[in-house]
Swiss-Prot record:
Keyword terms, alphabetized: Cell inner membrane, Cell membrane, Ion transport, Membrane, NAD, Sodium, Sodium transport, Translocase, Transmembrane, Transmembrane helix, Transport, Ubiquinone
EC number of this enzyme: 7.2.1.1
Record family assignment: Belongs to the NqrDE/RnfAE family.
Membrane topology label: Multi-pass membrane protein
A GO term from the CC aspect: plasma membrane
Species the sequence originates in: Yersinia pestis
Transmembrane annotation, as ranges: 42-62, 66-86, 103-123, 131-151, 178-198
Function: NQR complex catalyzes the reduction of ubiquinone-1 to ubiquinol by two successive reactions, coupled with the transport of Na(+) ions from the cytoplasm to the periplasm. NqrA to NqrE are probably involved in the second step, the conversion of ubisemiquinone to ubiquinol.
EC supergroup of this enzyme: translocase
Reaction equation(s) it catalyzes: a ubiquinone + n Na(+)(in) + NADH + H(+) = a ubiquinol + n Na(+)(out) + NAD(+)
GO molecular function ontology, one term from the record: oxidoreductase activity, acting on NAD(P)H, quinone or similar compound as acceptor
Name of the molecule in the record: Na(+)-translocating NADH-quinone reductase subunit D
PANTHER family hit by this protein: ELECTRON TRANSPORT COMPLEX PROTEIN RNFE (PTHR30586), NA(+)-TRANSLOCATING NADH-QUINONE REDUCTASE SUBUNIT D (PTHR30586:SF1)
Principal location listed in the UniProt entry: membrane
Gene: nqrD
Amino acid sequence: MADSKEIKRVLLSPLFDNNPIALQILGVCSALAVTTKLETALVMTLAVTLVTAFSSFFISLIRNHIPNSVRIIVQMVIIASLVIVVDQVLRAYAYEISKQLSVFVGLIITNCIVMGRAEAYAMKSPPIESFMDGIGNGLGYGVILVLVGFVRELVGSGKLFGVTVLETVQNGGWYLPNGLFLLAPSAFFIIGLLIWGLRTLKPAQIEKE
């Protein structure tokens, strides 16, 4: 029987209290690369959440039958299989977004969040809790991606989901887009500000010297 308190903890804790990007500093590379648009940030969130949740679930199901010496290989095979499925579904039903995400869908295989949850939680916990832990960490990753994508697309182009929100001067409006926000380094600064804001609200997250 699944423990409801544990499910609630693993589902909600990664959102802010133990965010994989803001606190654990995992999955930063893809956060820089796929957040120029809110649409790609949301699709990447969905892809990572599905892969993390189902890989944790399947790994937890067979955890007692995996020899310790090959556990990382088994985890990688399961994760890679799920990533291939997600990649093929995106190519079939969202080809343009798949092209924009480029190699970063494939690189979910090596995402530290996915591997980390498989090794640290799924190998020691029941399947339902592991599945919910995967969803929680995927959503925690997604919260940062969506916030960064929102700021970068709006400030960088005056659009959200490709729809004009702030009329630019090129089209007779008042807004002058800041192209710097469409470059990867801008995501570093936005993530840094989010980490600062989160640790200001939650001082317990500040590392002790």
